[in-house]
Amino acid sequence: GILRSMAVYVRSGGSTIQGGSTITQQLIKNVAFGGGMESSLGAKIKRKIQEQYLALQLEKVMDKKQILENYLNTINLGQNTLGVEAASERYFNKSVSELTLSEDAAIAAITQNPSKYNPITNPKDNASRRKKVLKKMLDLGYINQSEYDEALEDNLYDRIQIVNAQNESSASTSYFVDALTDEVVNDLVDQKGYTEAQAYQMLYSGGLTINSTQDSNIQTICEEEVNNNANYSDHVLYSFSYRLTVTKKDGTYQNYSEQTMLTYYQAQNPNYDINFSSQEECDQAIEQYKSEIMEEGDTIAEGGETITYTLQPQAAISVIDQATGHVVALVGGRGDKTASKTLNRATNITRQPGSCFKIIGCYAAALDAGGLTLASVQDDAPTSYANGTPLHNYDNRYRGFTTIRDAIISSMNVVTVKNLTQIGTGLGFEYAEALGISTLEPGDNNQTLCLGGLTHGVTDLELTASYATIANGGDYNKPVFYTQVLDHNGNVILDNTQNTSKEVLKDTTAWLLTNAMQDVITSGTGSGAGLSNMPTAAKTGTTTKNRDTVFAGYTPYYTAAVWGGYDDNTEQTYTAYAKLIWHSVMQRIHENLPRKEFTQPSGIVTAQVCKKSGKLAIEGVCDADPRGSMERDL
């Protein structure tokens, strides 16, 4: 069984494990010292001394077999499992006593490096290590040649993938918790020097107390509104994730998925997709696919077929307290979340932000350092990019001389590109990075930057944080999911309470952008999204063929951004749901909050300007123009 395999595996040096510690010391470290992940050399030395003393005492009351058995029940074996029994259930869905020799060796192979030799994520590396385990057992006489050959021929990795699919469909945590645990693990690695395996062990078995930033009421509201079909005006389709393992006549396995299905049918019809009007239609399509690919004598492996349905279009929302950077709520998808660590569309994918990026990639820089004001004018007329590609407004209309304020209100492409060209694309690129957009590539430093035409796009969370910077008077706060993490003794090991703000924009610039985006709500593309009891500022965004729809905005309390679209980038005929979700969420979370106003900084100056030139109006000339060519602006 597993004890025999593991004993052989660690046989070098008798009872010595990697790192020079005995098995007894390793057991003491795992049980008494939470895995021994101290951050300072002094603490490590102290722990080593205590380990050695306790190991001597333990060996007086337990024999080697008992110590080894206890050790095997505490070691990290990947996939957040501690001990061979947990690993056996996780990888093979059965007790350790039921494992075959082949399965024993696969688990034994994990011990040296649980991440590298994970049989789910790195099956080839595990197979190579497993072969060494079996060869060592053969050389030492624990198994014979026939047993060795039989174990090597066992294709157990398909079985592992089947069990993994079943496990993933039976456990679920919220999108917020997924993002929270990701942040804790990353910070343990980056700040404390842990390996990823050590960080996961600390997270799940180290007795940590994590103080999250989540507001449970806001989280519930976000989940309800993202999943409220009324917000989508009955535009509901279903896609699916599909896994099929077929046992062929010769005993080999063949794996299929929704991707192989898509490839199969698109070879016949390039426009074929896997979006259907009901789950029943999904099932019918799958049955048709199976009838075409399965041959006589093929059978579906036990537990070898899983289907997960996904509502389309999808949506995500992030809500941040701009004053602190605290993420108070986050939803990464629409529909039932059937497993932990599923695709989080708020944090783990990038999509094009569309016109929401006009503020981030152009106007923040233009007003802050480009020498322009909301009254600055460009001629909204047919033109082209520098490479000769024609440039159009979304409605193919042109309005002549137009101020920046009006360009923001009406989301005008031509005027925005002309303004970015005037200040230099490099300045817009620099400000976008300073506003927290980490996904930019050097190639994004071009005229399409201001329209959201990016190499990779942005995450919903980072877009929210960039708008939160404007809402916070120009000061950027890194978005965080926890305030503090404490160890089992109550000591603070990770601390976000000192989440230091960084000034990115002058407070006057932030206020000007806010003022213009308030007009977006009252008279522009964001009409209908205003709140009944709170001032709001926001910007809309859609991309080519409406593949993405985005709505980002804020109040004096909170900033939120909603993304919506099909997972496979299908064109959309209805895009208003991003604005509807944003409005519904923000209206509900502000219902009982005292009204606050956006505070105007002392440096703001107003003046009468000419709407055609953007220059100061000339008394006796502009005010005498019967067309009304003068307005008061900032």
Task: Indicate residue ranges for each PLM-predicted region.
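Mid-domain, small-residue-enriched loop/turn segments at the edges of structured enzyme/sensor domains
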Residues: 389-393, 424-465
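Active-site SXXK
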Residues: 137, 222, 324-325, 351-378, ...
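Active/ligand-binding-proximal structured segments within catalytic/core domains
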Residues: 1-9, 340-364
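Short, well-structured active-site flanking segments
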Residues: 1, 82-84, 144-149, 357, ...
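Peptidoglycan glycan-strand catalytic modules in the bacterial/periplasmic cell-wall system
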Residues: 1-149, 164, 197-199, 334-336, ...
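Non-catalytic structural connector segments
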Residues: 145-272
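A penicillin-recognizing enzyme superfamily signal
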Residues: 212-232, 238, 242, 246, ...
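Conserved catalytic neighborhood of penicillin-recognizing serine enzymes
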Residues: 11-35, 164-169, 371-428, 488-519
